[in-house]
Design a protein with these regions (language model features):
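Short beta-strand scaffold segments in enzyme catalytic cores
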Residues: 12-15, 34, 41-45, 144-147, ...
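Charged catalytic carboxylate motif
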Residues: 69, 111, 260
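ATP-binding N-lobe of GHMP and related small-molecule kinases
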Residues: 1-100, 117-122, 291, 311-322
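Short alpha-helix boundary/capping segments
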Residues: 62-65, 103-104, 202-205
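C-terminal nucleotide
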Residues: 2-22, 26, 48, 171-322
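Gly/Ser-rich oxyanion-binding loop with an adjacent helix/lid
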Residues: 79-172
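Short coil/turn connectors at secondary-structure junctions
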Residues: 39, 83-86, 149-150, 175-178, ...
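Charged/polar, low-hydrophobicity segments characteristic of intrinsically disordered regions
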Residues: 72, 145-157, 212-220
């Protein structure tokens, strides 16, 4: 009872913020992301004779809340499969980057969910049910449900476990996105940011705006309208951080380098390069552009002294040979 799977990290385009159900990880509103093709997590899951679940991430045992989130996935798989065996889970992140906002938790959730699903024999019962795997992955990290399906994905918030999952709605043939990732580190966790969001006086309005923006961004992607896409994703990133900063603790998750990269992107636009910035809950910046501009964008960021990862649109979670 063993399987191995790979899942790519994702760039959240319309970000979710806050959870109305923390156990099931049900968000307040829909969200949209695109998978990368440059960073991923490989997970191996085996069910057997262990006395307890063992979870290793990049060779280090997980404990506490990090382990609990993995066990939530394993428990759901065991429930569906009607088994009681404990599991050994091993994950490896590629590349190893000490930055926040690269989506490795989403890739881990997606790869663990698929590997556990197959290791427990659920594929023989339900077939390769991507929607079910998406729902299972959500229990580890909300965004993992989008990493499962890959390409351009929309997570429908739903009302409970049965209808909160992601659907792929477009791929690079619709919008041939390329993006330069500037990885930047921080200490805070995504969960802290989600809890902080709900105390912002602007949070309720954010829910309304985010659902409306999902419709606009989805339409722009399907129609290949890069300018509308870029403008909406930039605005969403700024709103996301504004919500966090106006919460009860006043969390500031951007760094001075985040602001420098934002200004570099604006300078690029003034010089005629189509480029737009995007951030998730951390300081890492994604610079979205088109194939004809990606080399120039990456070069300018490197000349400014930043490490750069260049990515295109990545696929969904997939099995790999052991």
């Amino acid at each position: 009872m063993r399987a191995k799977a790979r899942a790519y990290t994702m760039q959240a385009l319309v970000k979710y913020h806050g959870l109305k159900d923390w156990r099931l990880r049900i968000p307040y509103h829909d969200s949209i992301s695109v998978n990368t093709d440059v960073a991923y997590v490989v997970a191996e899951v085996s069910f057997g004779d262990s006395e307890e679940d063992v979870v290793m991430a990049n060779g280090t045992p997980l404990t506490g809340r990090a382990k609990e989130r993995v066990v939530a996935v394993l428990d759901r798989v065991r429930e569906l499969a009607g088994i009681k065996e404990r599991a050994v889970v091993r994950t490896e992140s590629h590349p190893r980057v000490g930055a926040k906002g690269l989506g490795f938790s989403s890739a881990a959730g997606a790869s663990i969910a698929l590997a556990a699903y197959v290791a427990a024999g659920l594929d023989k019962v339900y077939g390769r049910d991507v929607t079910l795997v998406s729902r299972i992955a959500r229990l580890l990290a909300g965004s993992a449900c989008r990493s499962v399906v890959g390409k351009y994905a929309r997570w429908y918030a739903g009302t409970g476990d049965h209808d909160s999952y992601a659907v792929r709605f477009a791929d690079e043939r619709n919008l041939p996105l390329r993006f330069a990732i500037v990885p930047l580190g921080m200490e805070a966790t995504t969960e802290e940011a989600h809890r902080e969001a709900e105390s912002s006086p602007y949070f309720r309005r954010r829910i309304e705006v985010a659902n409306e923006r999902c419709d606009r961004v989805e339409r722009a992607i399907k129609e290949g309208d890069f300018r509308t896409f870029g403008v909406e994703v930039e605005r969403d990133s700024l709103e996301l951080h504004a919500i966090t900063m106006t919460g009860s603790s006043g969390m500031i998750l951007m760094s001075p380098d985040t602001l420098r990269v934002i200004e570099l992107v604006r300078q690029m636009r003034r010089s005629g390069i189509e480029a737009y910035f995007s951030m998730q809950t951390g300081p890492t910046v994604y610079v979205n552009t088109l194939p004809e501009h990606i080399d120039e964008v990456a070069q300018r960021l490197k000349e400014a002294g930043y490490e750069v990862m260049v990515s295109g649109v990545g696929g969904g979670a997939e099995l790999v040979s052991s």
